[in-house]
Curated annotation (Swiss-Prot):
Part of the 30S ribosomal subunit. Forms a bridge to the 50S subunit in the 70S ribosome, contacting the 23S rRNA. This is Small ribosomal subunit protein uS15. One of the primary rRNA binding proteins, it binds directly to 16S rRNA where it helps nucleate assembly of the platform of the 30S subunit by binding and bridging several RNA helices of the 16S rRNA. GO terms for molecular function: rRNA binding; structural constituent of ribosome. It comes from Francisella tularensis subsp. novicida (strain U112). The keyword rRNA-binding applies. It holds the Pfam family Ribosomal_S15. SUPFAM superfamilies: S15/NS1 RNA-binding domain. Keywords: Ribonucleoprotein, Ribosomal protein, RNA-binding, rRNA-binding. One of its GO terms (cellular component) is cytosolic small ribosomal subunit. The lineage of its organism: Bacteria, Pseudomonadati, Pseudomonadota, Gammaproteobacteria, Thiotrichales. The gene is rpsO.
Amino acid sequence: MLTAQDKQKIIKENQLAEGDTGSPEVQVALLTARINDLQGHFETHKKDNHSRRGLLRLVSQRRKLLDYLHDKDVERYRSLIKKLNIRR
């Protein structure tokens, strides 16, 4: 589970301007952190299909934001996936 300090750190690292919390970069970074956190949960709870559905929803939401960013600005998209080590 991400703490408030973890979220603030992620926001600071990815924001485009001061106070920016809604840009695609920030949203994708936060979703990536939540997804990575959930993957550890599934190593110990392999049959937790209820949470797995939530994970798939998060992955889908991140994919949509990445597609949006790719359409708007390819360079920002490429730098973000390289920074977050996301496969594409």
